[in-house]
């Protein structure tokens, strides 16, 4: 993940993937490669493949043996945590049900956006002395106009970070 987020090779970040539906091998659960978070950032290739849901169709350029992968099977409401350098991915959903998840990234305030002009975060604890992020608060109501405009600003900043250096554009941000 750190390869294309524009946040550098930080250890001060963790991703929480919250299952909102059952997630198993048949539905294409995530797979982790144990210990891979200790690697440096690995080279990726932008495939822009139709069957890859990532913004650039990013794929790491290393071969991972099947026996090194661990299936992360979750029941609805369970959470998995992973480091931004953890090799991870998922296969296709071949079940009759949807695979639904929600992602939250916890980032220390000392982390800094390196490729986009700015980045946004919601402070959840403590004090941000570094001030590397534009802070925002939860919306006051559903579809509040001020926060819909803010959403568009955040989306544009994410596009700038995620697509920096890409050879072509992505429809993800259209």
Regions found by a protein language model. Give the residues of each.
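Short clusters of hydrophobic/aromatic residues that line enzyme substrate/ligand-binding pockets
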Residues: 5, 30-32, 124
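Short, surface-exposed loop/helix-turn segments at secondary-structure junctions
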Residues: 1, 55-65, 96-98, 116-123
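Non-heme Fe(II)-dependent double-stranded beta-helix
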Residues: 1-8, 45
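Non-heme Fe(II)/2-oxoglutarate
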Residues: 85-87, 91-174
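Short, structured patches in soluble enzyme cores that scaffold and shape functional sites
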Residues: 2, 18-22, 34
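Conserved catalytic motifs of the protein kinase core domain
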Residues: 13, 28, 99
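Double-stranded beta-helix
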Residues: 25-91
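Short, conserved beta-strand element in jelly-roll/cupin
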Residues: 7-25, 73-76, 81, 104-108
């Amino acid at each position: 993940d750190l390869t294309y987020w524009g946040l550098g090779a930080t250890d001060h970040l963790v991703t929480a993937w919250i299952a909102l539906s059952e997630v198993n091998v048949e539905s294409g659960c995530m797979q982790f490669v144990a210990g891979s978070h200790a690697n440096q950032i690995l080279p990726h290739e932008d495939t822009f493949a139709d069957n890859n849901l990532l913004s650039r169709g990013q794929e790491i350029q290393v071969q991972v043996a099947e026996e090194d992968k661990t299936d992360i099977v979750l029941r609805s409401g369970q959470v998995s945590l992973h480091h931004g350098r953890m090799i991870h991915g998922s296969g296709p959903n071949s079940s009759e049900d949807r695979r639904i998840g929600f992602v939250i990234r916890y980032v220390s305030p000392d982390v800094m956006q390196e490729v986009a002009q700015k980045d946004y975060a919601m402070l959840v604890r403590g004090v941000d002395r570094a001030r590397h992020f534009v802070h925002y608060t939860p919306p006051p109501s559903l579809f509040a106009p001020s926060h819909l405009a803010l959403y568009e600003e955040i989306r544009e900043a994410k596009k700038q970070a995620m697509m920096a250096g890409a050879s072509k554009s992505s429809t993800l941000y259209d």
